[in-house]
Amino acid sequence: MELKIGSTEAPMEKATFGAGCFWGVEAAFRKVKGVVSTSVGYMGGHFPNPCYLDVLSRITGHAEVVQIEYDPQLVSYEDLLAVFWDIHDPTTLNRQGPDKGEQYRSVIFFHNEQQAEAAQQSKAKVQVSGRFELDIVTEIKHKSEYYLATEEHQQYFEKQAKR
């Protein structure tokens, strides 16, 4: 279930990123001004209607992702890309920290051609910046079917803090 953070009258846009375990990725993007709602789920695989255990088993091809609804009048897609590069190591293939497997891969799923172009330009800029010693392995792909994760995974860190 998506939790609305704010509301405006302007049309919202969507962005989808995979950068490791979706719990932390979602928590980082929820702090960004202009992000209206977030949800976590799965994208980019070949297995229909996967559950967490399916994805964890590495048989689905899906990545854990956060889907973001944002107000482009308050935050740009390029700003969201900057957060994406800041919150994970885009040079490790199918791994973030101790989490290993293709479900933890670094991936940007674009929703339109403007996002595709911005993602490619951003990746190239970060690569030549010298910020990372190794090559960036982040995939840039057109969005595919998004499968919402179960409620227990939504805003996971916020729920844990309330315990």
From Swiss-Prot:
Its lineage opens with: Bacteria, Bacillati, Cyanobacteriota, Cyanophyceae, Nostocales
Q: What family is it from?
A: Belongs to the MsrA Met sulfoxide reductase family.
Q: Which Pfam families match?
A: PMSR (PF01625)
Please tell me which top-level EC class this enzyme sits in: oxidoreductase
Output this protein's name. Peptide methionine sulfoxide reductase MsrA 1
Reaction catalysed by this enzyme: L-methionyl-[protein] + [thioredoxin]-disulfide + H2O = L-methionyl-(S)-S-oxide-[protein] + [thioredoxin]-dithiol; [thioredoxin]-disulfide + L-methionine + H2O = L-methionine (S)-S-oxide + [thioredoxin]-dithiol
Q: Does the keyword Oxidoreductase apply?
A: yes
- Would I find Oxidoreductase among this entry's keywords? yes
Give the signal sequence positions. none
Q: Which domain of life is it from?
A: Bacteria
Active site residues per record: 21
Q: Give the function comment from the record.
A: Has an important function as a repair enzyme for proteins that have been inactivated by oxidation. Catalyzes the reversible oxidation-reduction of methionine sulfoxide in proteins to methionine.
What EC number(s) does its UniProt record assign?
1.8.4.11
Q: What InterPro entries does UniProt report for this protein, alphabetically?
A: Met_Sox_Rdtase_MsrA_dom (IPR002569), Met_Sox_Rdtase_MsrA_sf (IPR036509)
Recorded GO molecular functions are: L-methionine:thioredoxin-disulfide S-oxidoreductase activity; peptide-methionine (S)-S-oxide reductase activity
* One BP annotation, GO: protein modification process
